[in-house]
Amino acid sequence: MNDRLLVASRKGLFILHRRAGGWQLTAPHFIGEPVSMALADPRDGTLYAALNLGHFGVKLWRSRDGGAHWEACAVPVYPPQPETADPPPPPTPDQPPAAPWSLQQIWSLEAGGADEAGVLWAGTIPGGLFRSADGGDSWTLNRPLWDRPERALWFGGGYDYPGIHSICVDPRDSRHLTVAVSCGGVWQTDDGGEHWTCTTLGMHADYMPPERRDDPTIQDPHRLVQCAAQPEVMWVQHHNGIFRSVDAGHHWEDAVAQPSSFGFTVAAHPLRPDTAWFVPAVKDECRIPVEGRLVVTRSRDGGASFEALSEGLPPAPGYDLVYRHGLAVDDSGETLAMGSTTGALWISEDGGGRWQCVSAHLPPIYCVRFG
């Protein structure tokens, strides 16, 4: 069970603690500044906060004392872009605009394995994966993934350029990583990043022309998670539905949920591989809860069926949307947190059956994480 929750928002980082009377907010950190990602390193408790300051660039901060004091870390830096004899071709439906070789945002941040002290992984926009071996003091771009020829086909999903928003480190083998790209599919390495394979068999992209519907390199997984106890079981909330894999992401099967299979986020039960939670929405045109009613859907049978959970959530009309990193489950599998685009934060202590609103007046929430 985790007694601390990090909430990254458009106007700062909030830290909540579980007390005898419930979850309590403490004074905000980086007030007024957009915090795109936060991490509590499970190995040593170090906190990390990634900020996107627009014209002032991307910043990364680190705290070794629970947030009492913060120090600046290095940020990932792309190498110089090679000069080419010819300018890039103009964008076409089959050729998206070339991504810049410069950091736009830290979109995901994960600790390495338990046997890799100091190792961090950062997924970024415009699509580079970076590794730090020293707790954020320095970063190295993973060139084998960045140099894949398929990367030229990746394109932005929600942002102008593609980005890595999900990184799953296999707890049984730290050299086995799975990452998800919007829009660029799911990629895996078994050797710590030396070689990569696109593994999206079974996914489909209905937003593409029919002949490219099954193209693995342009799939749009919105969020990728794995079951901690059985990492070969993975879940994806995709632009075109919900997908589940039982063979470490090599094959995917879709699942149909009501009131919608569209959404941005998913959380996997850490102990029960058949259980996962989603937050459904209306696809494409509206991006709102179905019929203006916020619910959480839960499957406890591997996606064969879903139940809509709404006790404690606002009745219709309600237009809260939950971003990719806006839903989290703790290591017990019983406590969940959910933060919305309208600044509402809820906690459930019983696996999603009942929700309690901690605050309805926070800034728009980008990410919630226990730790």
Predicted regions span which residues?
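Extracellular glycan-interacting surfaces
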Residues: 1-371
